[in-house]
From Swiss-Prot:
GO terms for cellular component: cytosolic large ribosomal subunit. It comes from Pseudomonas putida (strain W619). Part of the 50S ribosomal subunit. PROSITE patterns: RIBOSOMAL_L1 (PS01199). It holds the Pfam family Ribosomal_L1. This is Large ribosomal subunit protein uL1. The gene is rplA. One of its GO terms (molecular function) is rRNA binding.
Amino acid sequence: MAKLTKRQKAIASKVEAGKVYNFEDAAALLAELSTVKFSESFDVAVNLGVDPRKSDQVVRSATVLPHGTGKTVRVAVFTQGPAAEAALAAGADRVGMDDLAAEMKGGDLNYDVVIASPDAMRVVGQLGQVLGPRGLMPNPKVGTVTPDVATAVKNAKAGQVRYRTDKNGIIHTSVGKVGFEAGKLKENVEALIADLKRIKPASSKGIYVKRVTLSTTMGPGLVIDQSSLNA
């Protein structure tokens, strides 16, 4: 049997198996256990009462977190004319049409979000095999295909997170960084859960938000007592 590392021993000694944690206690413990040399993210996993095999129960959307994620977001926009000027003014890192598509086909994909105006989809449509596997393909369901590209850029830069239920009916997303004030981190999680409840599929029956788990990039996952959240 492999020996536990010092970090693993610390986690094993402080994390109670099967315990449900108050949000503030969970955030504080995870921050305490974060001893790596980089700034870890706080991530949340929400188990939803949906059947992801049914298309009408796939939950896919985007939420602008009130305090962002703490990450610098690079945004590329496919658009032209006045909309291109508006996108640049809103903070887009790169704006273009065929020229931008050529760059991406050539391997320049150093972007976190790709946005497109509807008239640009004739160009973006050629990039499915390039953008799709990376989760960058613009989609109207998450607000990345829109005539109002400037607002989409502002939302992305402000810390908008995008998510989709996986095959087990769970959504995963980052909600902040270790070092965030607990109150701000909590408000981010509450905003996410409120949005999830708002878009609950009509065909979903029974308990919708089954479990909320908070973790750090390299840390354990702690189950959160939902009564400690205002959502």
